[in-house]
C-alpha cells in the first residue's frame, strides 16, 4: 500500500514485533521532502527479518521513492530511478520502544502499572505486554495513562482486590476497570504510605497493610484504619526504610531508624509483638517468609 513506509536495516525485524509501538528519531525524511510524519511514535504493521512497515501519509513532494541514510547524508531516489537528491544529516536513525520513568510499579489484571512523580501521571502498559507503554490503536488492549491532580510525590504502589493502588503520603488513588475506555480513577484524602515505606505494602487475607506517617494502616476496600494504636507513633515516623511481609496471618514489619526493629502484628488477635531477629530485607512466597541481612 502506498500510504505505508518500509524501514530496512540489518536485523531490524528481530528487535520488534507486529503491533509494537516504536519511536523513530533522527530520520531525514522531512528534510528530504519525503514526509514530516516518520519521526515520532509509529505502529509496526508488518515485520520481516531485516525490515518493518509503518504507516506514513503521503505528503512530501518526494514521498514515492527510496531514502538511504547514514550518519553523514541521506540519499533519495525515485521509484523509477530517474530522480536523485541528497541532503546532509547530523544524526543516525534510532528506533525504540519507549518505557516511561516509573517510581513504583505493580501488576494488576495482566498489566504492569506504574507512576511518575515528575509528571504526576499513572501509566499502564499494553495488555499482556510490558514492553509497550505508548500503544494507542483504539482497542481494548491499548496502553493507558492518566494525570492525577493531587500534590506531592508518589510513595508506593500495590494491587489488592482487583484495584491498582497508588499512594502519596496523604492520598490514595484507586484505578479500576477492564479496558482503557472504562478505566476510572478515584482519589481519597487519607493517611497514605510514608516516605521510604513503599516496601511496607503487603496484602494479607484480602487486606492491604502499610506504614503511614501516622502508624501502620489496614485497607480493606473502604477507608484505611489504624491498627498500631498500641505502639508509640513517634517511633514509627521518619523511617529510613520499611519492609513488610506476611506469614500465617501475621504481618511482619521491619523498620530502620536510628536502630532496626522487627514488629509482628497478629491480624486475627489484633496483637503486636517484637522479634529479636532484625533482618534488613524479607519476602514471602509459597507459604514461607524469608528474612536475610
Go through each PLM region and give its residues.
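Beta-sheet-dominated scaffold domains
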Residues: 110-111, 150-293
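Small/polar beta-strand repeat architecture
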Residues: 1-98
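Surface-exposed acidic, glycine/proline-enriched linker/cap segments
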Residues: 89-91, 137-144, 246-250
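Surface-exposed ligand/attachment interfaces on beta-rich extracellular proteins
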Residues: 9, 30-34, 95-99, 147-151, ...
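Generic recognition of cysteine residues
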Residues: 5, 56, 78-81, 85, ...
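Residue-level detection of beta-strand scaffold positions
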Residues: 21, 102, 142-144, 207, ...
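Predominantly extracellular/luminal cell-surface or secreted proteins
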Residues: 25-27, 55-57, 78, 123-137, ...
